[in-house]
Structures are given as structure tokens and as C-alpha cells.
Amino acid sequence: MRCPKSAVTMRNEELLLSNGTANKMNGALDHSDQPDPDAIKMFVGQIPRSWSEKELKELFEPYGAVYQINVLRDRSQNPPQSKGCCFVTFYTRKAALEAQNALHNIKTLPGMHHPIQMKPADSEKSNAVEDRKLFIGMVSKKCNENDIRVMFSPFGQIEECRILRGPDGLSRGCAFVTFSTRAMAQNAIKAMHQSQTMEGCSSPIVVKFADTQKDKEQRRLQQQLAQQMQQLNTATWGNLTGLGGLTPQYLALLQQATSSSNLGAFSGIQQMAGMNALQLQNLATLAAAAAAAQTSATSTNANPLSTTSSALGALTSPVAASTPNSTAGAAMNSLTSLGTLQGLAGATVGLNNINALAGMAALNGGLGATGLTNGTAGTMDALTQAYSGIQQYAAAALPTLYSQSLLQQQSAAGSQKEGPEGANLFIYHLPQEFGDQDILQMFMPFGNVISAKVFIDKQTNLSKCFGFVSYDNPVSAQAAIQAMNGFQIGMKRLKVQLKRSKNDSKPY
């Protein structure tokens, strides 16, 4: 008959557990005093700071017997406080991997905003199999495993050698070789890569480190994202086609808006102080330019017109877009350029002229941030639609025009640059591998992005899986929400919403 544990014995076990010592825990009775030779020490982040080893043991034990748990604590505090992360070692490698598959980026613990981060500790990476495993390509199909071993054994001890075979059992002309150390694998790469061309092969032998699971997952996500972005771009060009069909209606509205008799209708519009008659006329000209560019896609004339270059080039002038003393008369006089552009429907617009459409960025702030009165809501709604179509066209045609410079400026500024009210987005459920460049490329088709940032956990240096994107106008932000909210990447669906205003929390 087994005697119950005394209170002193139970208290001693709790102390051993809380100190993070290698105390053999429940479920470990079938194991020796030490974990298996290939056991993995795992780092676990995003755990509540209030949790001790006892709560963590209950979390991990369903996946296998736990050998050791060590909570990282800040020793500068008295008593030492948890840093919200720990190390855990299971008795078996299988248990550690099962726990990682079930918890990493999946389970969110009580009181935490982000899911658990679980990965092999840095000390385990020094000799991980993925760091010692080589891929051998352009191998003669006449070779077997023994031939490959003989070829690579001079570089060190080989733990595993396997030729990749098809369903028919025949070699596919490639193999995997795992050495005992990474240094051996590196020596094999230096000596063997492209050193010879084997029988029946068209190229020299390829020797490189095998792709890791993370590499494969990242490549799969990139391919999936590329396909989905292609679909988005196709939809964007479809919107442009629709714009071309309705252009005469929009041009009529824009011309009417720029006439001297109608300028008074805009007096009641909020935030229109910086948008003068010439800017509205420029917007009308851009609509005509978009129509000409759309028509030119099917034209057989390959010679760009110099008149188109001069007309579109004028649109990019910051003076034309920002002159505060422009008059209605000057705006009406400049409508001659609009007539010129309308006459180009059957002509080809050269690439330089399409590049000139980037000048639309100067118009982004005024129209998108406008509040409307009842009298002008219908007209401005049509203007907004026309402007949105032109904007999406320019972003689709010139996806790399400003992405690199934007990231450089953002990095130099060191902080998140925000757009006007209603133009700032909060994006949840981003893939772990996404960085600033990825999120920027994803949201560029909807307008002029002035800032794109993925947030990184300073302790783990891993993505927090959320970020911000700011446009220079609310129209683009709403277009991005409509297209990207619920957009699936891998196993995740993006959640895209407007960033809450700073004034929302104020009672007045």
C-alpha cells in the first residue's frame, strides 16, 4: 500500500518546480532521468507574466512528459518577475514538435493579445538537422544510395543518405545527404557544387543546403500571394475598363464643376480651402488622359504624340496643383488642354505619358477628405468615382514607382506617419513572415500609400501579425477595406478596418 505524500514533501516538490530545476514531472515515470538524445529545448513566448511553472506544466503535459520548465525572470526586481516567456524540455522530440504544432501561432492564453510563440531555443539551432542536410541535384539516375555515400563520405560522417524516387521506384535524379555537423556539410558544398557533370545529366551537379520547412512555407505563401495579387490587379484593370465606358459622363460633370458659375456650389464643402478651380480642372484632364490610355491599349499606332506628353507633363507640375491665386477664368482658359486630350481617343499613349499619370498624387488630399453638403453630394459622388478609377489605374500600372523610396523615408523618420482622418487602416492576422515591403505591395493598388508598417515584438524579434497602412485620402482607405477585408493568405483571413480616431476616447 502506497503512503500518501507528506505536506513537507509536497512543498519541497513545489519549490523545486518553481525554481526551474530539472525535476522529473508527472507522466515521466516511464522515462529515464534524462531526456532522449534528440530531445529539443523549446522557447515559448506570449505567456502570462502571472503564470508559474505549475500552470505551464498543465499546458504542456497533454502533449507529452515534461522534463524541465524554466520561466525567464527579471532578476533586477524584488521578487524577480516573469518576463512572459520560458524554456520547456520534453523527454521526447516527438512531444515537443506536437506541442509546437498545436500551440505556435494558434492558441492564445488568457489575458494575452497574441498567440503563443513556440520554437526551438537558439542553443538547439546550432546542430539542428535542417542545418546539416544537403540537397544533391543533377545526380545520374544510375546512382544508388551507396554511390552517393562513397561520393560524399570524404567530407565527414553521414547520418542519412536518401535518393528521391518516383512511384515507379526509379530515381528522380536527386538525393538528400545529412552530415553529423554543419561544418562537414559546408565543406561538401565547397568541394562538390558544380564540380562535375554526371552521366545522363545536362548540367553540373548541384550541392546546397536543403530547404527548411520555413523556407517551403514562405515560398508557398509568396506564390499564393502573387496569384491573389494578380487577381486583384485583373480586377483593377476591369474597373479601369468600366471607367473608360463612363468617361463622357464624368467629363461632363467635371467640366461643369470647373465652370465659373458652379464654383460657388463648393463654398459649403468642408476642407476644400486648398482645392481651387485649376485643381478640379486638372482632375478632369486626368480623367480624359485615362480614357486615352485605355483606348491606346488596342491601338495599332505605336508612335507616342508629343502633344500628349506636354499635356500630361503639365499635370505633374506642383505649381499648377498648388497655386493659391488661380482664378476661375484661368481655369476655363486651360480647358483647351482637355479638348486636346479628348481628341486622342484613337492614338497610342507612350510609356512616358502613362508615367506622367503619377502626378495624380498631388490631388489625393483634397477630394478624398471632403465633407459634403446636401446640394453637392450627387455631383461629388460621381467625381469621387472617377477619381478612384484613375487612382487605381495609376497604382496598377506603376506598382514600384515609390515603394522603395517610401520605405526608406519611413525608416529614416523612425515612426508611423499618419494620413488624414479616415485614411489610416489597422490590419490584423498578417502572416508571420510578412514585413513592411509585403504589406506595402499588398495595399498599393488602392491609392497613394504614405506609410506601411508591420509591428515587431522587441523581445522575440518576431512579427506581432498586425500592422498599419496610411493613405493620403479616405477614398483609398475605403477601397482597400472593401477589397482586402477577409482576403485569405495561407490559413489566415485579413481583418482590415479603420484605425480608431484619437478623439474617439475623449468625452467632449
Curated annotation (Swiss-Prot):
Record keywords: Cytoplasm, Disease variant, Epilepsy, Intellectual disability, mRNA processing, Nucleus, Repeat, Repressor, RNA-binding
GO biological process assignments: mRNA splice site recognition; regulation of alternative mRNA splicing, via spliceosome; regulation of heart contraction; RNA processing
UniProt xrefs under SUPFAM superfamilies: RNA-binding domain, RBD
Chief place of localization: nucleus
Domain of life from the UniProt record: Eukaryota
Pfam families found in the cross-reference section: RRM_1 (PF00076)
Location of the region described as Necessary for RNA-binding, TNNT2 exon 5 and NMDA R1 exon 21 inclusion in the Swiss-Prot/TrEMBL record: 1-283, 357-508
Keyword Repressor: yes
Known tissue expression: Expressed in frontal cortex. Isoform 1 is expressed in brain and lung. Isoform 2 is expressed in heart, brain, placenta, lung, liver, kidney, skeletal muscle and pancreas. Isoform 4 is expressed in heart, lung, skeletal muscle, kidney and pancreas.
Subcellular location, record wording: Nucleus; Cytoplasm
CDD domains assigned to the protein according to its UniProt record, in alphabetical order: RRM1_CELF1_2_Bruno, RRM2_CELF1_2, RRM3_CELF1_2
GO cellular component, one term: intracellular membrane-bounded organelle
Presence of keyword NADP: no
Single annotated GO MF: pre-mRNA binding
Residues covered by the RRM domain: 40-123, 132-212, 423-501
Quaternary structure (record): Interacts with A1CF.
Protein role: RNA-binding protein implicated in the regulation of several post-transcriptional events. Involved in pre-mRNA alternative splicing, mRNA translation and stability. Mediates exon inclusion and/or exclusion in pre-mRNA that are subject to tissue-specific and developmentally regulated alternative splicing. Specifically activates exon 5 inclusion of TNNT2 in embryonic, but not adult, skeletal muscle. Activates TNNT2 exon 5 inclusion by antagonizing the repressive effect of PTB.
Disease named in the record: Developmental and epileptic encephalopathy 97: A form of epileptic encephalopathy, a heterogeneous group of early-onset epilepsies characterized by refractory seizures, neurodevelopmental impairment, and poor prognosis. Development is normal prior to seizure onset, after which cognitive and motor delays become apparent. DEE97 is an autosomal dominant form.
Assigned protein family: Belongs to the CELF/BRUNOL family.
Name of this protein: CUGBP Elav-like family member 2
Organism (species): Homo sapiens (Human)
